[in-house]
């Protein structure tokens, strides 16, 4: 192989100029090594390795970092990059044949030479420790097959799997037939068999290299790892996996030919299976997160072949590189960032390296671990038994923080919560086997260099930095600064090469680093400027998982009342433990911390308090590596001095708002009354702040948490050039969503597609390599017909939303899919069998959030007619089912009506305007006056599924309906002054007395609202049972008589009942009513007068002009009554309001006040009201949304579509800005139903953009 061949093949990769950048870098690394050596030397230092310069190639034990430290302490030199002229010894455990040939007689020494020389106190001869000796001409060697030259084209994709299999088989057969392998005079298949020939070069010919960070790496490019692949806390040695049992050369020589052939076949299969398992495990490994310029190896058998002649060099960035648990993947040694998002393993690679993904996954696993413990608990806790034994032999004296002795008071059996939190979790795990780094500033990050990175063309870090500073001050209204006035002020000149500070984020930093101003989340480049001695260590996900599991297993040995907060912290209720063991909280906390430290070698701090809030605050005082018990008598003084930012739920936005009120501490916050806080922050948040600032917290330690959503989002490395790439990526992300839904055992119904798009004016190239930069966030949401976990369905819906966005593909910087409205995978809410339970739960009397309303709304496929019924069922809080029976009542409405109790009380009555009910209070949501429909409308299967007591009540009401005296006038009583409120003109009331007092006029009355008969389809009416036809006819006759009795009554007015959550400003009371023009001889202007979602002018054009065409006799009553007052005004209902139309010949009529939202009429007032509602409440109530829907439909009735359009668009902007996804759901609900009304009224819909 020509020496210059590699240089020719990699002339464009930017690494060939050794005389410039690399020479300066090597010199800088050597100077840094000498500086560190001077600082590290102490009494144990020596000069054993004076004049020795080592270079570590691949995996070694001790690791490369440990060898570096040993050379530093004992006078040697450590070279990150091999130099033929300067390096004296190459340290390696194993090398493939290609590298052995390239060394050409260089000294390759085992790492034991260094260790044993230090033990002996002198420099030992390296001859006995040579890894390979130069073979003589008489020495036999393996007959290696020639491998493909790097210049040769790689195999086609269709033949890769076959060629890999043939290659493995060929290698094994060659190994099996060889008689001996000389390595240092010893026969060793492990050292010179498979590892020499089955090299990574062969795999690369089968799976050609991909672009890494935009640069195509040649197949024989050396990627030198210097031992950074071995984790001292238990990295796997897959060499053992790759060696079949009984494959020793000596053992094979003793076998006869038959046995040898059998063993060859078995070894072939074993080796192939083991190799495949290793490669699959490597691909799935979560420990492969590394910097963009680093790729690591785990197995010495899979090193890439390396030229050690100065042409090849490592991509390790600096001498501070340390051990890692990176696992080799099949695709170019697990490149830190796959070349393109369109690659099939891009998503899996990204999540295998994502710290946040691992943290969230671990939390779910630990939560499930705790739940499993509780389900399988036998009540036996080994930890408690140990504590009891320890308690008998211990004194009640403990040493306090001040060093004095104090007698612990006897434990009191009061509520006690402990917050266990590991100190600097990622750092503690990373250095637990690194005593040389303890006590030094350490940070866990993906960058292990000097804190700088090359400046890429087109990037403008200073502009991005200024933009984010402006955004912190001005919020989302911040503009992008003019790029022409900004220069790269954070760039530096390093060896003549422009560079910028590294944007790698610090995941965790030690307390020593925090003392100089370094914080978690800070960019490593800036942190390196604050602390030049900052040591960077890599992520060790495997070890972190082990430590987290060990901590939770320790806690579980004492109690199962555990709330998994994160992988490194947990809340436990220790009240029972203290009562059983008779220990004080301080004693138990000390024992717990000692046990955790013994098992994990990591320190944990414990905060103790009477509730979760105080325990968390106590932990902050206990850190680092301590414990603190916040006594009840100390709470008041302690809490007053705490900053409000220490309270849960107080973020930057709320902090700035509190600061504007002059509040910085909890003591300041205590000066405000609850009314003031609720006015400023809303009812829930105001009450929360009022309690938390006083140390009050009634939250229990929750072991189970309901999962609200499943999502997969990627905002790193997203760069598309064609729409097909983006579409393929969305389909791949949909498959990831399917895997996560299946793992969670859930299905989702609502999909949200989130796209990050480069903000206009932002730099095309981001300051952080592969980052998203300055972006706008765009989201689209769709609700599926049924809950699903199918990637095919999710992908199709996602692509439809994506196509509607019409984005510039090259500007996409992030993609995410979120699934809401989760249901268990073994249930199906869309089937009829599950509908009764879901609906009856809505009317169980307990408060419900808007999510329940949406779940009810989407319980059936929303065809046009069914959509009407669902909407009415959601809006009509009285669920007047019979009013929709004449309009072909849907099964859903019947189920709703049949699943509730008919009982009515004075606090559960509501007013209805134009078919819409206004809620009375937040406490009576959906628990209002629910009437039972006629017997013919009740589904018997639903009735039989109801509880016995409820079913008996409904049967009694039905019996009373059949025996009800017709034509007798009923009056509401029992103080239900608002129970029988005026209904819109054209509505018929069926009044049904309670079965207990069927003949008593003072009994309770259930009122069922029927539409005007002009709304009834004659064919539908004719198809009804004769009994129901008689019942309806009697009701309309009764309506006619009531109209005659109330013709001369004067209407009285009351204000519409207001929702307390929407009553943010007092509504104006209007007693004067506007006059309408004479409507003689003309149909009504709006169908909302009769029924909300039906237009008589469109559906029944002849209903008003000639009712005789429908049904003789019965329609005459309707024709006479349709233009007369309808409502019955009782003396016991002084607040009732008469909404009646004029008889023919009258010149005017009364109507409700102008459309208002909780009293707000002007658009400016409505905007203020909506903004306060949306920004102060995180979970809107059903009645709030329904009241907004009612306001919008009132605007439609008044034909004020201009204001309606402004209101809808303003709500859309506000709700999309909210971080709560439920607000988007609320807006979609409002918009869907407004569009239905518009479509029925005007034959068109609003165009909302």
From Swiss-Prot:
<keyword id="KW-0479">Metal-binding</keyword>
<comment type="subunit">
    <text>Interacts with FAAP20. Monomer. Interacts with the DNA polymerase zeta which is composed of REV3L and MAD2L2; the interaction with MAD2L2 is direct and requires that REV3L is in its closed conformation. Interacts with POLH, POLI and POLK.</text>
</comment>
<keyword id="KW-0548">Nucleotidyltransferase</keyword>
<dbReference type="InterPro" id="IPR001126">
    <property type="entry name" value="UmuC"/>
</dbReference>
<feature type="compositionally biased region" description="Polar residues">
    <location>
        <begin position="1048"/>
        <end position="1057"/>
    </location>
</feature>
<feature type="binding site">
    <location>
        <position position="520"/>
    </location>
    <ligand>
        <name>dCTP</name>
    </ligand>
</feature>
<feature type="binding site">
    <location>
        <position position="421"/>
    </location>
    <ligand>
        <name>Mg(2+) 1</name>
    </ligand>
</feature>
<dbReference type="InterPro" id="IPR031991">
    <property type="entry name" value="Rev1_C"/>
</dbReference>
<dbReference type="GO" id="GO:0003887">
    <property type="term" value="F:DNA-directed DNA polymerase activity"/>
</dbReference>
<feature type="binding site">
    <location>
        <begin position="508"/>
        <end position="514"/>
    </location>
    <ligand>
        <name>dCTP</name>
    </ligand>
</feature>
<feature type="binding site">
    <location>
        <position position="568"/>
    </location>
    <ligand>
        <name>dCTP</name>
    </ligand>
</feature>
<feature type="compositionally biased region" description="Basic and acidic residues">
    <location>
        <begin position="1035"/>
        <end position="1047"/>
    </location>
</feature>
<dbReference type="InterPro" id="IPR053848">
    <property type="entry name" value="IMS_HHH_1"/>
</dbReference>
<dbReference type="GO" id="GO:0005634">
    <property type="term" value="C:nucleus"/>
</dbReference>
<feature type="region of interest" description="Protein interaction domain; mediates interaction with DNA polymerase zeta">
    <location>
        <begin position="1150"/>
        <end position="1249"/>
    </location>
</feature>
<dbReference type="Pfam" id="PF16727">
    <property type="entry name" value="REV1_C"/>
</dbReference>
<dbReference type="InterPro" id="IPR012112">
    <property type="entry name" value="REV1"/>
</dbReference>
<dbReference type="Pfam" id="PF14377">
    <property type="entry name" value="UBM"/>
</dbReference>
<dbReference type="InterPro" id="IPR017961">
    <property type="entry name" value="DNA_pol_Y-fam_little_finger"/>
</dbReference>
<dbReference type="InterPro" id="IPR036420">
    <property type="entry name" value="BRCT_dom_sf"/>
</dbReference>
<feature type="binding site">
    <location>
        <position position="421"/>
    </location>
    <ligand>
        <name>Mg(2+) 2</name>
    </ligand>
</feature>
<dbReference type="GO" id="GO:0042276">
    <property type="term" value="P:error-prone translesion synthesis"/>
</dbReference>
<feature type="short sequence motif" description="Nuclear localization signal">
    <location>
        <begin position="1072"/>
        <end position="1078"/>
    </location>
</feature>
<feature type="binding site">
    <location>
        <begin position="421"/>
        <end position="425"/>
    </location>
    <ligand>
        <name>dCTP</name>
    </ligand>
</feature>
<feature type="region of interest" description="Interaction with target DNA">
    <location>
        <begin position="350"/>
        <end position="360"/>
    </location>
</feature>
<feature type="domain" description="BRCT">
    <location>
        <begin position="44"/>
        <end position="131"/>
    </location>
</feature>
<dbReference type="GO" id="GO:0009411">
    <property type="term" value="P:response to UV"/>
</dbReference>
<dbReference type="InterPro" id="IPR043502">
    <property type="entry name" value="DNA/RNA_pol_sf"/>
</dbReference>
<dbReference type="GO" id="GO:0046872">
    <property type="term" value="F:metal ion binding"/>
</dbReference>
<dbReference type="InterPro" id="IPR036775">
    <property type="entry name" value="DNA_pol_Y-fam_lit_finger_sf"/>
</dbReference>
<feature type="site" description="Interaction with target DNA">
    <location>
        <position position="768"/>
    </location>
</feature>
<feature type="region of interest" description="Disordered">
    <location>
        <begin position="253"/>
        <end position="323"/>
    </location>
</feature>
<dbReference type="Pfam" id="PF11799">
    <property type="entry name" value="IMS_C"/>
</dbReference>
<dbReference type="InterPro" id="IPR001357">
    <property type="entry name" value="BRCT_dom"/>
</dbReference>
<feature type="region of interest" description="Disordered">
    <location>
        <begin position="1035"/>
        <end position="1109"/>
    </location>
</feature>
<keyword id="KW-0808">Transferase</keyword>
<comment type="function">
    <text>Deoxycytidyl transferase involved in DNA repair. Transfers a dCMP residue from dCTP to the 3'-end of a DNA primer in a template-dependent reaction. May assist in the first step in the bypass of abasic lesions by the insertion of a nucleotide opposite the lesion. Required for normal induction of mutations by physical and chemical agents.</text>
</comment>
<feature type="region of interest" description="Interaction with target DNA">
    <location>
        <begin position="707"/>
        <end position="715"/>
    </location>
</feature>
<keyword id="KW-0227">DNA damage</keyword>
<dbReference type="InterPro" id="IPR047346">
    <property type="entry name" value="Rev1_UBM1/2"/>
</dbReference>
<protein>
    <recommendedName>
        <fullName>DNA repair protein REV1</fullName>
        <ecNumber>2.7.7.-</ecNumber>
    </recommendedName>
</protein>
<keyword id="KW-0238">DNA-binding</keyword>
């Amino acid at each position: 192989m020509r020496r210059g061949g590699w240089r020719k093949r990699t002339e464009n990769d930017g690494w060939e100029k050794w005389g410039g950048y690399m020479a300066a870098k090597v010199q800088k690394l050597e100077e840094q090594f000498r500086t560190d050596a001077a600082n590290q030397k102490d009494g144990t230092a020596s000069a054993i390795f004076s004049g020795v310069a080592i270079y570590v190639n691949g995996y070694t034990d001790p690791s490369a970092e440990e060898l570096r430290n040993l050379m530093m302490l004992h006078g040697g030199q450590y070279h990150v990059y091999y130099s033929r002229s300067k390096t004296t010894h190459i340290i390696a455990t194993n090398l493939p044949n290609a590298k052995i040939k390239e060394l050409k007689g260089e000294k390759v020494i085992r790492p034991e030479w260094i260790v044993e020389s230090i033990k002996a106190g002198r420099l030992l001869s390296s001859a006995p420790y040579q890894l390979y000796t130069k073979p003589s001409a008489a020495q036999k060697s393996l007959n290696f097959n020639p491998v493909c030259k790097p210049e040769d084209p790689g195999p086609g994709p269709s033949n890769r799997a076959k060629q890999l299999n043939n290659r493995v088989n060929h290698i094994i057969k060659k190994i099996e037939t060889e008689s001996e392998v000389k390595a240092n005079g010893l026969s060793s298949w492990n050292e010179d068999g498979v590892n020499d020939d089955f090299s990574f070069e062969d795999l690369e010919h089968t799976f050609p290299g991909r672009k890494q960070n935009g640069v195509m790496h040649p197949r024989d490019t050396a990627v030198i790892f210097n031992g950074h692949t071995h984790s001292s806390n238990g990295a796997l040695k897959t060499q053992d996996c790759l060696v079949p049992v009984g494959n020793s050369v000596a053992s094979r020589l003793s076998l006869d030919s038959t046995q040898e052939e059998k063993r060859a076949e078995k070894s072939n299969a074993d080796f192939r299976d083991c190799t495949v398992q290793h490669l699959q495990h490597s691909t799935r490994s979560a420990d492969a997160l590394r910097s963009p310029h680093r790729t690591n190896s785990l197995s010495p058998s899979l090193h890439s072949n390396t030229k050690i002649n100065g042409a090849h060099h490592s991509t390790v960035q600096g001498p501070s590189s340390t051990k890692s648990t990176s696992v080799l993947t099949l695709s170019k040694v697990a490149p830190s960032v796959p070349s393109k998002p369109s690659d099939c393993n891009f998503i899996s690679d990204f999540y295998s390296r994502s710290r946040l993904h691992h943290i969230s996954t671990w939390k779910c696993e630990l939560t499930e671990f705790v739940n499993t413990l509780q389900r399988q608990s036998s009540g036996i806790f080994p930890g408690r038994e140990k504590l009891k034994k320890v308690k008998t032999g211990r004194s009640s004296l403990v040493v306090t923080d001040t060093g004095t002795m104090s007698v612990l008071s006897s434990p009191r059996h009061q509520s006690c919560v402990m917050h266990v939190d590991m100190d600097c979790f990622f750092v503690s795990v990373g250095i637990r086997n690194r005593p040389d780094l303890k006590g030094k500033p350490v940070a866990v990050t993906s960058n292990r260099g000097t804190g700088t990175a090359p400046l890429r063309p087109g990037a403008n870090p200073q502009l991005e930095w200024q933009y984010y500073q402006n955004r912190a001050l001005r919020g989302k209204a911040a503009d992008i600064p003019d790029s022409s006035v900004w220069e790269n002020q954070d760039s530096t000149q390093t060896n003549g090469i422009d560079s910028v500070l590294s944007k790698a984020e610090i995941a965790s930093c030690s307390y020593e680093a925090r003392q100089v101003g370094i914080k978690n989340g800070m960019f490593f480049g800036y942190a390196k400027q604050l602390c030049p001695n900052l040591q960077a260590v890599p992520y060790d996900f495997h070890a972190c998982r082990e430590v987290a599991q060990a901590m939770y297993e320790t806690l579980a040995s004492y109690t199962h009342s555990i709330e998994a907060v994160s992988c490194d912290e947990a809340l436990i209720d220790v009240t029972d433990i203290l009562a059983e063991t008779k220990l004080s909280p301080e004693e138990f906390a000390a024992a717990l911390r000692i046990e955790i430290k013994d098992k994990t070698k990591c320190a944990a701090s414990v905060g103790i308090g009477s509730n979760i809030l105080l325990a968390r605050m106590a932990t902050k005082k206990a850190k680092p590596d301590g414990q603190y018990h916040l006594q009840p008598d100390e709470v008041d003084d302690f809490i007053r001095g705490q900053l409000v930012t220490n309270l849960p739920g107080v973020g930057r936005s709320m902090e700035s708002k509190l600061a504007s009120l002059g509040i910085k501490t909890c003591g300041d916050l205590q000066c405000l009354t609850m009314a003031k806080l609720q006015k400023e922050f809303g009812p829930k948040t105001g009450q929360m702040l009022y309690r938390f600032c006083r140390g009050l917290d009634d939250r229990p330690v929750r072991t189970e948490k309901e999962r609200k959503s499943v999502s997969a989002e990627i905002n790193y490395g997203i760069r598309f050039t064609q729409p097909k790439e983006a579409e393929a990526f969305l389909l791949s992300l949909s498959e990831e969503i399917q895997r996560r839904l299946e793992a969670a055992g859930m299905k989702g119904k609502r999909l949200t597609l989130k796209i990050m798009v480069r903000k206009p004016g932002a730099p095309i190239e981001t300051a952080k390599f592969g980052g998203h930069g300055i972006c706008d966030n765009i989201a689209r949401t769709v609700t599926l017909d049924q809950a699903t976990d199918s990637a095919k369905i999710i992908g199709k819906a996602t692509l439809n939303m994506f196509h509607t966005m019409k984005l510039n593909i090259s500007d996409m910087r992030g993609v995410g899919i979120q699934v809401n409205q989760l249901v268990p995978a073994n249930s199906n809410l869309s089937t009829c069998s599950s509908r009764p339970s879901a609906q009856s739960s809505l009317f169980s009397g307990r408060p419900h959030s808007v999510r329940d309303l949406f779940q009810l709304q989407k319980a059936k496929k929303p065809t046009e007619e069914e959509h009407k019924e669902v909407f009415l069922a959601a809006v009509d809080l009285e669920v007047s089912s019979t009013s929709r029976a004449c309009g072909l009542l849907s099964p859903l409405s019947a189920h709703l009506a049949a699943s509730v109790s008919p009982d009515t009380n004075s606090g559960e009555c509501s007013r209805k305007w134009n078919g819409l009910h206004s809620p009375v209070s937040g406490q009576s949501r959906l628990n209002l006056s629910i009437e039972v429909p006629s017997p013919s409308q009740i589904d018997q299967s639903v009735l039989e599924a109801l509880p016995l007591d409820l079913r008996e009540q409904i049967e009694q009401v039905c019996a009373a309906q059949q025996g009800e005296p017709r034509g007798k006038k009923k009056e509401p009583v029992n103080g239900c002054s608002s129970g029988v409120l005026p209904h819109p003109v054209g509505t018929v009331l069926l009044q049904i007395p309670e079965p207990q007092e069927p003949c008593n006029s003072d009994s309770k009355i259930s009122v069922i609202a029927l539409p005007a008969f002009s709304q009834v389809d004659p064919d539908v009416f004719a198809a009804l049972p004769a009994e129901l036809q008689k019942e309806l006819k009697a009701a309309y006759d009764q309506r006619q008589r009531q109209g005659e009795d109330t013709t001369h009554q004067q209407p009285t007015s009351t204000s519409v009942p207001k929702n307390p959550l929407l009553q943010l400003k007092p509504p104006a009371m209007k007693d004067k009513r506007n006059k309408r023009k004479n409507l003689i001889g003309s149909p009504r202007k709006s169908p909302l007068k009769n029924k909300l979602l039906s237009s008589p002018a469109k559906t029944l054009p002849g209903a008003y002009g000639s009712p005789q065409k429908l049904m003789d006799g019965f329609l005459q009553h309707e024709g006479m009554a349709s233009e007369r007052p309808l409502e019955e005004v009782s003396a016991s209902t002084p607040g009732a309001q008469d909404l009646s139309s004029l008889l023919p010949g009258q010149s005017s009529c009364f109507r409700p006040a102008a459309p208002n939202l909780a009293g707000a009429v002007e658009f400016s007032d409505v905007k203020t009201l909506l903004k306060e509602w949306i920004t102060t409440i995180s979970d809107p109530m059903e009645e709030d949304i329904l009241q907004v829907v009612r306001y919008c439909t009132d605007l439609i009735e008044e034909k004020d579509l201009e204001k309606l359009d402004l209101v809808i668009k303003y709500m859309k902007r506000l709700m999309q800005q909210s971080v709560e996804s439920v607000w988007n759901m609320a807006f979609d609900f409002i918009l869907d139903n407004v569009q239905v009304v518009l479509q029925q009224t005007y034959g068109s819909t609003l165009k909302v953009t």
